[in-house]
């Protein structure tokens, strides 16, 4: 009988834990502003599994996913758009994409963008 530890979900959870230990600079900056309900009292989770994906940040009560897009995402527009549609269809979430350069250059501007999606 296969072990539950061999399941794809377990692998994603393990990977998400590892990703939390080594955030990108922009993810680290944004997490500092979001953690412990610091931004508008909203609870965010980081590197959260929404099977089959791991999202950068997730606000469950608002059903909002926040993705910080760095250089890796610049040529992945179609793939990212399909992923966003999957997340919306399967989980009923909205996806906000924020450029990593904006987070690093002007965190307050990035938070204003995010705030515009929180209502």
What kind of feature is each model-predicted range?
Residues 18-24, 46-117:
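Basic, amphipathic alpha-helical patches used to engage nucleic acids or provide basic targeting signals
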């Amino acid at each position: 009988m296969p072990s539950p530890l061999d399941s794809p979900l377990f692998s994603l959870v393990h990977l998400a834990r590892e990703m939390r230990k080594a955030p990108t600079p922009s993810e680290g900056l944004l997490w500092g502003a979001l953690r412990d309900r610091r931004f508008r009292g909203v609870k965010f989770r980081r590197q959260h599994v929404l099977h089959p994906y791991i999202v950068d940040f997730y606000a469950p009560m608002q059903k909002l996913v926040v993705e910080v897009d760095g250089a890796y995402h610049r040529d992945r527009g179609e793939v990212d758009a399909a992923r966003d549609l999957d997340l919306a269809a399967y989980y009923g979430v909205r996806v906000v994409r924020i450029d990593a350069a904006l987070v690093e250059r002007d965190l307050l501007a990035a938070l204003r963008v995010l705030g515009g999606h929180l209502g």
